C-alpha cells in the first residue's frame, strides 16, 4: 500500500483516478491492519470509492453509472467468515474511513461491498499441522517461571518461547541466562541485522531457546524447531496457529505448549472453542515432584537478577551525576569536597558488601543447579541439595 500511494502522490496521470477499476485484490488482508499500513491503505481505499448520489433529487448533476467491481480478500484469519456474515446481515453500503488503530473488523467496513459477500473456505478441519502435538501446563503465576525452566530442562533441542511484550522477553532472558540456559532473543525493537544474526545463531545451535515476540510468529522458517512454548497466551486464535506453525513443518513432528494461569482461563476457553478442541488441550506430563527444588533455584535466580538490576541502575545514575558535574564545571569548597569524599567512601564500602553478597549468591545458585542436575529426584530438604 505504501508504494502504491507513493506512485499516486507523484502526479502520474492514470493513477489519479482509480474509481474505474473492475477488480480490487488484497492479499494477506489481516496483515494490512498491522502497524505501518493504516494510513497508506486508507488513502488507496478512498481513491476507489465511487461518488454517492446526492440526497437532493432535484440536483441536475448526473453521476456516471457505478462500476461493478469485484473485491477479493485473501486471508489466513479465522475471523473473516464471521465478519462477512455480520456485514451481510447489516448490509452496510456506506464505507467507514480507515484510521490508525484499525482492526480487521474496521478494514472490512472500510471497503464498499456492492453485493453480498461470499466466503470460500479452503482451510482443513484441523487448523494446525497434523503432526503437531498440543498440550498445556496449568500453573500459578508464582510457579510459571519454574515450570518453564523445568520444561526446558526436560526437553532438549531448539525451542521458541513466545511472549506478548518485549519487557517479558527481556526479563526472561536475564533470568534464564542466570539459570545457565542458552538463550537468544528476537523482538520488534531489534535492528534487522541483529534479528538476522540471532536467527543464524539459532539455526546453528542444536540446544537453544529463542525468546520472541509475535514478530517471529509469521514468515519464520527455521528447520528443526522441536517445540514452541506460549509463555503468554496469544491474543487470538490466528496468532496461536501462526506461532505453533513454527514447529511441525514439512511433515515433521512438533510440540506446542501453552502455559495457562488462572487469569487466562477465559481466553483459553475461547481459544479451545475456535480451535475446535471441545475437551481442551491435554496436560503435558512433567516430573512435578522436582518442582519444589526448581522453585527454590528459580527464586534465588530472581533475587540475583533483581539485585543486579538495582545495582546497575545505581551505577548508571552515579555515572550520569559525575558527568553532569564535570560538564557544568561546578566549583566546590574544601568542606563540601571533604563531605563528598567521606560519603563516597561509605558508599564504596556499602557497594563492596553488596557485590560480595551478590557473588556469594551466584556461587550458591551454581551449586544448587549442579546438585539438582546430578540428582534431580533428591528431596528438597536433603543435605545433598
Locations of the language-model features?
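Conserved helicase ATPase core of P-loop NTP-dependent helicases/translocases
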Residues: 147, 158, 167-217
Amino acid at each position: 500500500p505504501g508504494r502504491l500511494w507513493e506512485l499516486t502522490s507523484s502526479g502520474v496521470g492514470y493513477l489519479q483516478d482509480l474509481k474505474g477499476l473492475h477488480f480490487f485484490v488484497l492479499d494477506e488482508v489481516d496483515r494490512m491492519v498491522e502497524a505501518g499500513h493504516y494510513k497508506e491503505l486508507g488513502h488507496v481505499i478512498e481513491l476507489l470509492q465511487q461518488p454517492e448520489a446526492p440526497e437532493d433529487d432535484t440536483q441536475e448533476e448526473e453521476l456516471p453509472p457505478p462500476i461493478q467491481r469485484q473485491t477479493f480478500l485473501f486471508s489466513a484469519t479465522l475471523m473473516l467468515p464471521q465478519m462477512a456474515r455480520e456485514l451481510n446481515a447489516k448490509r452496510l453500503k456506506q464505507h467507514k474511513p480507515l484510521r490508525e488503530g484499525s482492526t480487521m473488523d474496521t478494514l472490512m467496513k472500510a471497503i464498499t461491498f456492492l453485493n453480498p459477500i461470499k466466503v470460500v473456505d479452503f482451510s482443513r478441519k484441523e487448523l494446525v499441522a497434523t503432526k503437531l502435538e498440543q498440550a498445556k501446563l496449568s500453573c500459578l503465576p508464582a510457579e510459571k517461571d519454574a515450570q518453564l525452566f523445568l520444561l526446558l530442562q526436560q526437553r532438549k533441542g531448539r525451542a521458541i518461547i513466545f511472549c506478548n511484550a518485549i519487557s517479558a522477553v527481556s526479563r526472561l532472558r536475564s533470568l534464564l541466562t542466570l539459570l545457565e540456559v542458552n538463550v537468544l532473543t528476537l523482538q520488534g525493537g531489534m535492528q534487522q541485522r541483529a534479528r538476522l544474526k540471532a536467527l543464524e545463531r539459532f539455526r546453528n545451535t542444536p540446544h537453544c531457546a529463542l525468546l520472541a515476540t509475535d514478530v517471529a510468529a509469521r514468515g519464520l522458517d527455521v528447520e528443526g524447531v522441536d517445540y514452541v512454548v506460549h509463555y503468554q497466551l496469544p491474543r487470538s486464535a490466528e496468532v496461536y496457529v501462526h506461532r505453533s506453525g513454527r514447529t511441525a513443518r514439512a511433515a515433521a513432528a512438533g510440540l506446542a505448549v501453552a502455559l495457562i494461569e488462572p487469569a487466562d482461563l477465559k481466553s483459553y476457553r475461547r481459544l479451545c472453542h475456535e480451535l475446535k478442541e471441545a475437551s481442551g488441550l491435554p496436560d503435558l506430563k512433567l516430573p512435578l515432584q522436582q518442582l519444589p527444588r526448581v522453585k527454590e533455584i528459580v527464586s534465588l535466580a530472581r533475587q540475583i537478577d533483581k539485585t543486579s538490576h538495582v545495582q546497575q541502575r545505581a551505577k548508571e545514575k552515579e555515572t550520569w551525576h559525575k558527568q553532569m558535574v564535570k560538564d557544568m564545571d561546578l566549583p566546590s569548597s574544601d568542606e563540601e569536597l571533604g563531605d563528598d569524599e567521606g560519603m563516597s567512601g561509605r558508599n564504596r564500602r556499602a557497594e563492596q558488601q553488596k557485590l560480595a553478597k551478590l557473588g556469594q549468591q551466584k556461587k550458591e545458585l551454581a551449586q544448587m543447579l549442579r546438585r539438582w542436575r546430578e540428582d534431580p529426584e533428591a528431596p528438597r530438604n536433603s543435605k545433598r541439595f
